[in-house]
């Protein structure tokens, strides 16, 4: 692995010097539209009801989708794949425009520029193209099969990342596995999630408000994989992205498989209550789920809710990051502290995968050094403007509850989002982990990080892992994703204990030596709450998205990253080439090739 990284460093170094640091290979270029607003509708502003889809029009839309639902369900996998690839091409064309609109609303910060939004949007062609690959393989009669399958205890593990030869070069040192539910058998069913034929039904997707890419994956699953005619209701918070999604999904809209509508609570109520809607998918909060499923009635474990249609949901989480005590060097401490800060800063911390609880060993001899580095990293980062409605109120509640918390960060100097208030990074003082602690059970949805300690004997890694497992499983609210960082020497000395930790931790996605943020951006991994939540205690939700191999019976995903990445990760606030890097990522996912890989490697080493 080290020799491979070294070879790429040498190659990229030569390439970066070529033409004074500018790579000019026409086959690397991606043709994009200039930053402009989609002609389908004028640009929308949050809270502007002028463009809300009228309720009577919603009824017509559902009727139209329902009338063609059976025909769409019978659409061949080959045709679905073709449409998916067309949508992926459209996503590249609108990339500059949707990025420009995103930073106009959310803000553009000196150290990342527009690269954060562009790199997030690159997930769109990634998930669409990868879904197309699976559908094409199934159409040919050969299920697209992952890189390898092996057993770990009662679990079958399926290696789904990296898969292609190019991905192996680019992501050397990373390993992503789907963990199937115990008892599911030694052979996974590739394509088991794909539905073709049947009577067809209409699905309502209530889109996320924080990231424009989230409904893309929802649509890919419901329309392309499950074969549902779908109406996507844009969240009022990011309805500005709707016209760009309309253009991206124009092939599916023309095929009669998708419509995009606008509005707020009234729109959601009308759609979910429509008699010809067969199922619902939500990305949002548990409160939204409860409002739909329980309809204002008290939640009960011994009785079904009044809403009887199937509802899948990807909801929130108080995301824990566990730092396993070990012989971390100063440079390693600094790098891992930066990883934590990056996930808190990303998207103004309005992410269900943002680090919210940092779990350390109270007696770790490097604890104070880590906390010092963490403060330094926060203080070097610009504060973000709190664009999401209600986020500032949540933040203020934490300020009131923890008067000794530290407020850190550089003043915001963003372009755009001037009307929104910048929020300092709020670091809650260290204390013991507790299931009654606000820092562990209340999702802040703002730049808040709780420091929580486990009082285990110094040097007893097994005791720490057991305590950490208990803490994340029983004291932290939600089960969507988590991360754990462990020094290679520590893992080697405690291999069995760490494997048991990964087996027993009840989260839908687990990052090992990498933020769970990256788990989200690998479309072949699953994304969703850990199985087992009930309608009366939904927490992080039910059902999963992504999983572009369409393998059924998935319990969770585990993504391992290298302890010391050879280049600065693209999500890092310390990346010095974010603008070029994000566009190279987009180009690679739009058209994986040696040329686009070269461009990406050059951009990466310049970061």
Which sequence ranges carry the predicted segments?
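C-terminal core of ALDH-fold dehydrogenases
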Residues: 82, 463-571
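NAD(P)-dependent aldehyde/semialdehyde dehydrogenase
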Residues: 326-327, 346, 352, 360-481, ...
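PLP-dependent aminotransferase-like
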Residues: 202, 214-266
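Short loop-to-beta-strand entry elements in the cores of soluble alpha/beta enzymes
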Residues: 76, 84, 226-237, 307-326, ...
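N-terminal Rossmann-like NAD(P)+-binding subdomain of aldehyde/semialdehyde dehydrogenases
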Residues: 28, 33, 37-188, 221-222, ...
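N-terminal chloroplast transit peptides
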Residues: 2-7
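Conserved NAD(P)+-binding/catalytic subdomain of aldehyde/semialdehyde dehydrogenases
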Residues: 202, 236, 251-362, 533-534, ...
């Amino acid at each position: 692995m080290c020799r491979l990284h070294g070879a790429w460093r040498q190659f990229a170094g030569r390439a970066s010097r070529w033409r004074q640091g500018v790579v000019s290979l026409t086959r690397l270029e991606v043709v994009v539209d200039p930053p402009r607003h989609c002609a389908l509708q004028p640009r929308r502003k949050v809270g502007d009801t002028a463009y809300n889809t009228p309720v009577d029009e919603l009824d017509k839309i559902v009727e139209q989708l329902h009338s063609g639902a059976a025909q769409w369900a019978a659409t061949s996998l080959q045709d679905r794949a073709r449409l998916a690839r067309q949508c992926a091409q459209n996503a590249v064309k609108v990339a500059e425009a949707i990025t420009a609109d995103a930073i106009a609303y959310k803000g553009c910060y000196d150290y990342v520029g527009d690269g954060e939004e562009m790199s997030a949007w690159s997930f769109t062609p990634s998930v669409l193209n990868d879904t197309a690959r699976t559908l094409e393989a199934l159409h040919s009669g050969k299920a697209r099969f992952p890189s390898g399958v092996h057993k770990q205890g009662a679990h079958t593990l399926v290696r789904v990342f990296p898969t292609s030869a190019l991905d192996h070069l680019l992501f050397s040192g990373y390993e992503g596995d789907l963990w199937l539910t115990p008892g599911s058998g030694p052979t996974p069913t590739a394509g088991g999630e794909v539905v073709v034929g049947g009577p067809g039904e209409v699905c309502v997707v209530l889109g996320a408000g924080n990231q424009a890419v989230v409904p893309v994956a929802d649509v890919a699953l419901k329309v392309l994989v499950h074969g549902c005619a779908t109406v996507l209701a844009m969240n009022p918070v990011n309805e500005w992205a709707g016209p760009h999604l309309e253009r991206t999904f124009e092939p599916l809209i023309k095929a009669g498989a998708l419509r995009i509508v606008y509005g707020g609570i009234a729109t959601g109520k009308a759609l979910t209550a429509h008699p010809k809607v067969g199922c619902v998918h939500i990305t949002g909060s548990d409160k939204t789920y409860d409002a739909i499923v329980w309809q204002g009635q008290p939640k009960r474990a011994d009785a079904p809710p009044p809403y009887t249609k199937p509802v899948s949901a990807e909801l929130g989480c108080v995301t824990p990051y566990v730092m396993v005590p070990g012989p971390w060097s100063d440079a390693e401490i600094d790098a891992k502290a930066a990883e934590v800060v990056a996930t808190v800063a990303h998207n103004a911390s309005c992410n269900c995968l943002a680090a919210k609880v940092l779990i350390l060993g109270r007696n770790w001899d490097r604890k104070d050094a880590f906390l010092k580095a963490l403060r330094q990293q926060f203080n070097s980062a610009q504060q973000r403007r709190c664009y999401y409605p209600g986020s500032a109120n949540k933040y203020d509640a934490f300020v009131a509850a923890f008067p000794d918390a530290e407020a850190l960060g550089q003043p915001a100097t963003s372009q755009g989002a001037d009307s929104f208030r910048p929020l300092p990074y709020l670091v809650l003082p260290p204390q013991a982990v507790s299931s009654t602690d606000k820092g562990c059970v209340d999702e802040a949805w703002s730049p808040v990080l709780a420091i929580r300690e486990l009082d285990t004997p110094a040097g007893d890694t097994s005791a720490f892992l057991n305590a950490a497992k208990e803490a994340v499983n029983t004291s932290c609210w939600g089960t969507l994703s988590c991360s754990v960082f462990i020094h290679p020497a520590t893992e080697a000395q405690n291999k069995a204990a760490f494997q048991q930790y990964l087996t027993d931790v009840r989260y839908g996605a687990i990052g090992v030596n990498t933020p769970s943020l990256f788990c989200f951006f690998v479309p072949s991994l699953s994304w969703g709450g850990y199985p087992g939540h009930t309608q009366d205690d939904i927490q992080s939700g039910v059902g999963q998205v992504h999983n572009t191999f369409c393998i059924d019976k998935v319990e969770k995903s585990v993504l391992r990253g290298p302890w010391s990445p050879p280049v600065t990760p693209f999500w890092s606030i310390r990346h010095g080439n974010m603008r070029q890097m994000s566009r190279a990522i987009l180009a690679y996912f739009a058209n994986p090739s040696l040329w686009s890989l070269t461009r990406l490697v050059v951009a990466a080493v310049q970061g």
